[in-house]
């Protein structure tokens, strides 16, 4: 399921997004940067609890989360990143809403 609003698309990630996600997190300069491999694993094996915001063909947002198998009604949000050029537009909130829907 994709959620399009204007040129912004909110969707699940795929393995091809991992490099762009890594660069987005690196460029944020505020979030802990994991290895490129960690983002590949998130975009592939944990894609059901991760979200991409795409503006045009560019990844401008990423949300990663984890649902514990021991407590299925709890969602741990690990990272939320939005490109500096796209902040203050409600993208983080839209990604979280998409994930919870």
Which residues make up each language-model segment?
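Conserved N-terminal entry element of GNAT/NAT acetyltransferase domains
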Residues: 1-16
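Conserved GNAT acetyl-CoA-binding A-motif
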Residues: 101
